[in-house]
């Protein structure tokens, strides 16, 4: 139903679907993976009762910035995507959208996001420039380093300190435990994503943690996920979260075990499905946080 609704926009303009695909609005998994951790931080910062204004700002800010990230990513990869089986049909790689049009769209999305941030406070506004820098840099990192997933993790986690400053006007040291947890988790699930493209990436010279980790990939992913859970446990102790939060962590841990099992043969589709499955882990942790505050 969601996809059909998006496809109906072609009635408004024949190229609308191309731009929807460029922003990946037809594939909301990236929105979820960015949204859940941002909401973890917002709920914890507000002790379970975030303001309606901030909830609106961060939900729509996530949607806009994820779309902007996809646009600049495809712009950076436009000469690579045509050589990768999974990405060769993307609008920029296939020529349906021109690079100049993509840059204009990126500027519009970033501007809209910044307008939302203007309704917060000075600290959050200043922090937003760091998020923009990370989002703009990430797509180019795979040309120069085997750690682009770390930059992605930093970018995907940046909304968390912003949520704290928007809600409370301050950034307590323990908030960085949430940030580090999400960074580690992002590196883990995006390595699964990179494993799906590893053979194509090796041919075209693109770098990733999947290539760097080699045969130790699944073991390192499991270790990163374990460290992420440990950071969340420590953060939970500092923020005095209780049984429901810990129940959410247990569900997330079960998700990680399932992913480890399903990727034992390292088949590309299994790795891609493991990446997608992380949405449920993030949701479980969010539900745990919400229930922990709501049922006190």
UniProtKB/Swiss-Prot annotation:
Pathway: Cofactor biosynthesis; ubiquinone biosynthesis. The gene is ubiA. It comes from Ectopseudomonas mendocina (strain ymp) (Pseudomonas mendocina). It is found in: Cell inner membrane. The chain crosses the membrane at residues 29-49, 55-75, 102-122, 124-141, 146-166, 169-189, 216-236, 239-259, 271-291. Catalyzes the prenylation of para-hydroxybenzoate (PHB) with an all-trans polyprenyl group. Mediates the second step in the final reaction sequence of ubiquinone-8 (UQ-8) biosynthesis, which is the condensation of the polyisoprenoid side chain with PHB, generating the first membrane-bound Q intermediate 3-octaprenyl-4-hydroxybenzoate. One of its GO terms (molecular function) is 4-hydroxybenzoate polyprenyltransferase activity. One of its GO terms (cellular component) is plasma membrane. CDD domains: PT_UbiA_COQ2. Its main location: membrane. Its EC number is 2.5.1.39. It is a multi-pass membrane protein. It comes from the Bacteria. Keywords: Cell inner membrane, Cell membrane, Magnesium, Membrane, Transferase, Transmembrane, Transmembrane helix, Ubiquinone biosynthesis. This is 4-hydroxybenzoate octaprenyltransferase. Belongs to the UbiA prenyltransferase family. It is an enzyme of class 2 (transferase). It catalyses: all-trans-octaprenyl diphosphate + 4-hydroxybenzoate = 4-hydroxy-3-(all-trans-octaprenyl)benzoate + diphosphate. Its cofactor is Mg(2+). InterPro entries: HB_polyprenyltransferase-like (IPR006370), Prenyltransferase (IPR039653), UbiA_prenyltransferase (IPR000537), UbiA_prenylTrfase_CS (IPR030470), UbiA_sf (IPR044878).
């Amino acid at each position: 139903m969601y996809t059909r609704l998006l496809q109906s926009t072609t009635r408004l303009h024949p190229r609308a679907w191309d731009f929807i695909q460029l922003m990946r609005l037809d594939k909301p998994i990236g929105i979820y993976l960015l949204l859940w951790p941002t909401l973890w931080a917002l709920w914890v910062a507000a002790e379970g009762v975030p303001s309606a204004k901030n909830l609106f700002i961060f939900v729509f800010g996530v949607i806009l910035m994820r779309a902007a990230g996809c646009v600049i990513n495809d712009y950076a990869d436009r000469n690579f995507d045509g050589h990768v089986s999974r990405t060769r049909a993307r609008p920029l790689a296939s020529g349906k959208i021109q690079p100049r049009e993509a840059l204009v769209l990126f500027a519009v999305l970033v501007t809209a996001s910044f307008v939302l941030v203007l309704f917060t406070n000075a600290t959050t506004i200043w922090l937003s420039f760091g998020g923009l820098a990370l989002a703009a840099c990430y797509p180019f990192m795979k040309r120069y380093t085997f750690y682009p997933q770390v930059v992605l993790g930093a970018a995907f986690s940046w909304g968390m300190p912003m949520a704290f400053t928007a809600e409370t006007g301050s950034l307590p040291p323990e908030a960085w435990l949430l940030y580090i947890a999400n960074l580690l988790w992002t590196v883990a699930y995006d390595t699964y994503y990179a494993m799906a493209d590893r053979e194509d990436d090796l041919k075209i010279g693109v770098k990733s943690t999947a290539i760097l980790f080699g045969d130790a990939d699944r073991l390192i992913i499991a270790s990163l996920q374990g460290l992420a859970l440990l950071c969340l446990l420590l953060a939970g102790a500092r923020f005095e979260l209780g049984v429901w939060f810990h129940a959410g962590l247990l569900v997330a841990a079960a998700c990680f075990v399932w992913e480890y099992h399903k990727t034992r043969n390292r088949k590309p589709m299994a790795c891609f499905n493991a990446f997608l499955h992380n949405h449920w882990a993030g949701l479980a942790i969010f539900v745990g946080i919400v229930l922990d505050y709501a049922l006190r």
